[in-house]
Regions:
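HIT superfamily nucleotide-processing domains
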Residues: 1-125
Length: 125
Protein backbone atom coordinates (compact mmCIF):
# COMPACT_ATOMS: atom_id res chain seq x y z
CA UNK A 1 0.00 0.00 0.00
CA UNK A 2 1.30 3.44 -0.91
CA UNK A 3 1.78 5.82 2.02
CA UNK A 4 -1.15 8.18 2.49
CA UNK A 5 -0.62 11.89 3.08
CA UNK A 6 -1.35 11.18 6.77
CA UNK A 7 1.32 8.47 6.93
CA UNK A 8 3.77 10.95 5.40
CA UNK A 9 2.81 13.43 8.15
CA UNK A 10 3.28 10.73 10.81
CA UNK A 11 6.73 9.92 9.38
CA UNK A 12 7.67 13.62 9.41
CA UNK A 13 7.93 13.82 5.62
CA UNK A 14 5.22 16.51 5.54
CA UNK A 15 5.01 19.13 8.32
CA UNK A 16 1.91 19.61 10.43
CA UNK A 17 0.54 21.66 13.29
CA UNK A 18 0.69 18.88 15.90
CA UNK A 19 -1.77 19.00 18.79
CA UNK A 20 -1.18 15.60 20.42
CA UNK A 21 0.77 12.40 19.81
CA UNK A 22 1.12 9.04 21.50
CA UNK A 23 2.41 5.65 20.36
CA UNK A 24 -0.77 4.83 18.38
CA UNK A 25 -2.26 8.17 17.27
CA UNK A 26 -1.49 11.66 16.02
CA UNK A 27 -3.77 14.71 16.20
CA UNK A 28 -3.01 17.76 14.05
CA UNK A 29 -4.81 20.82 12.71
CA UNK A 30 -6.57 20.46 9.37
CA UNK A 31 -4.88 22.81 6.86
CA UNK A 32 -8.27 23.52 5.23
CA UNK A 33 -10.41 23.88 8.36
CA UNK A 34 -14.17 24.26 8.37
CA UNK A 35 -13.75 26.23 11.64
CA UNK A 36 -10.65 27.37 13.49
CA UNK A 37 -9.47 24.50 15.67
CA UNK A 38 -10.60 21.80 13.19
CA UNK A 39 -8.33 18.89 14.10
CA UNK A 40 -7.79 15.45 12.58
CA UNK A 41 -7.09 12.38 14.72
CA UNK A 42 -5.38 9.59 12.79
CA UNK A 43 -4.11 6.15 13.76
CA UNK A 44 -0.44 5.56 13.06
CA UNK A 45 -1.48 2.22 11.57
CA UNK A 46 -2.64 3.09 8.03
CA UNK A 47 -5.92 1.47 7.08
CA UNK A 48 -8.48 2.89 4.67
CA UNK A 49 -11.65 2.55 6.74
CA UNK A 50 -12.01 3.19 10.46
CA UNK A 51 -13.90 -0.07 10.92
CA UNK A 52 -10.90 -1.97 9.49
CA UNK A 53 -8.71 -0.91 12.42
CA UNK A 54 -7.73 -3.60 14.92
CA UNK A 55 -9.77 -3.10 18.10
CA UNK A 56 -6.75 -1.84 20.05
CA UNK A 57 -6.04 0.89 17.48
CA UNK A 58 -9.73 1.84 17.21
CA UNK A 59 -9.93 2.27 20.98
CA UNK A 60 -6.71 4.35 20.91
CA UNK A 61 -8.16 6.67 18.23
CA UNK A 62 -11.37 7.15 20.20
CA UNK A 63 -9.42 7.75 23.43
CA UNK A 64 -7.45 10.48 21.65
CA UNK A 65 -10.69 11.95 20.24
CA UNK A 66 -12.07 12.08 23.80
CA UNK A 67 -8.94 13.77 25.20
CA UNK A 68 -8.89 16.26 22.33
CA UNK A 69 -12.60 17.07 22.73
CA UNK A 70 -12.09 17.71 26.45
CA UNK A 71 -9.08 19.94 25.72
CA UNK A 72 -10.97 21.79 22.99
CA UNK A 73 -13.94 22.50 25.24
CA UNK A 74 -11.68 23.59 28.11
CA UNK A 75 -9.44 25.88 26.02
CA UNK A 76 -11.88 27.22 23.43
CA UNK A 77 -15.07 27.09 25.49
CA UNK A 78 -17.01 25.45 22.68
CA UNK A 79 -18.65 22.05 22.49
CA UNK A 80 -16.78 19.85 20.00
CA UNK A 81 -18.42 17.87 17.23
CA UNK A 82 -16.92 14.85 15.52
CA UNK A 83 -17.23 13.53 11.97
CA UNK A 84 -16.05 10.27 10.48
CA UNK A 85 -16.38 10.51 6.71
CA UNK A 86 -13.88 8.07 5.24
CA UNK A 87 -13.85 9.09 1.58
CA UNK A 88 -11.39 11.95 1.13
CA UNK A 89 -8.11 10.31 2.23
CA UNK A 90 -7.49 6.53 2.20
CA UNK A 91 -6.40 6.57 5.85
CA UNK A 92 -8.91 6.24 8.70
CA UNK A 93 -9.41 9.49 10.63
CA UNK A 94 -11.82 11.49 12.77
CA UNK A 95 -12.53 15.21 12.37
CA UNK A 96 -12.93 17.02 15.72
CA UNK A 97 -14.18 20.61 15.54
CA UNK A 98 -15.36 23.23 18.01
CA UNK A 99 -18.99 23.92 17.19
CA UNK A 100 -19.82 27.47 16.23
CA UNK A 101 -23.21 28.82 15.06
CA UNK A 102 -21.56 30.35 11.98
CA UNK A 103 -20.14 26.95 10.91
CA UNK A 104 -21.27 25.75 7.49
CA UNK A 105 -20.55 22.11 6.69
CA UNK A 106 -18.17 21.78 3.75
CA UNK A 107 -17.11 25.46 3.65
CA UNK A 108 -13.38 25.80 4.31
CA UNK A 109 -11.35 28.67 5.71
CA UNK A 110 -7.91 29.85 4.61
CA UNK A 111 -6.15 30.75 7.86
CA UNK A 112 -2.71 32.34 7.85
CA UNK A 113 0.33 30.50 9.19
CA UNK A 114 0.26 32.83 12.22
CA UNK A 115 -3.39 31.91 12.91
CA UNK A 116 -2.59 28.20 12.60
CA UNK A 117 0.40 28.48 14.96
CA UNK A 118 -1.66 30.45 17.48
CA UNK A 119 -4.37 27.77 17.45
CA UNK A 120 -1.74 25.03 17.76
CA UNK A 121 -0.31 26.76 20.84
CA UNK A 122 -3.79 27.02 22.40
CA UNK A 123 -4.81 23.42 21.78
CA UNK A 124 -1.54 21.45 22.11
CA UNK A 125 -1.34 19.10 25.07
Amino acid sequence: MEDSVFTKIIKGEIPCYKIYEDDKTLAFLDIAPEVMGHTLVVPKNQVDKIYELPDEDYVAVMATVKKLAQQMEKVLGKRPIMKVIGVDVPHAHVHVMPFSPEWKDGVTLEPSEAEMKAMQEKLAF
